[in-house]
Amino acid sequence: VIIAAADKIRRSCDTIGGRLFRAQRYANSLKEVARSRGYSDQQIDAFLDSKAERAKVREKRNVYFQNQGASNLDHASLCVLGYAEIARNSQIGYLLKAR
């Protein structure tokens, strides 16, 4: 959800960019956690490629946005949220940068 939220914010707000190497490192660390819990690379890839799982992640992301007073359909609110996340240096903010 963290990567999905950061990605949506960076795509919706022209004045916020993504720290793509950080996002890739974070994604790789999540894969390592899954491997350490016994999941195979094939299982991990199937999960990541699943349309149903992607829909669940989008729904959780949108609920997070709503809880923060933003909307996935309102670019201005996502910009405000993005700057707040950057200022807090949250997990989402760590993956974003002001341009």
Where are these regions (language model features)?
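Conserved glycine-rich, hydrophobic/aromatic-active-site segments
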Residues: 1, 21, 25-28
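Immediate post-signal-peptide N-terminus of mature secreted/exported proteins
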Residues: 1-18
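Generic signature of mature, soluble extracytoplasmic domains
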Residues: 11, 21-22, 35
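Mid-length scaffold segments of soluble, non-membrane domains
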Residues: 18-20, 39
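Compact alpha-helical subdomains of small soluble proteins
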Residues: 25-99
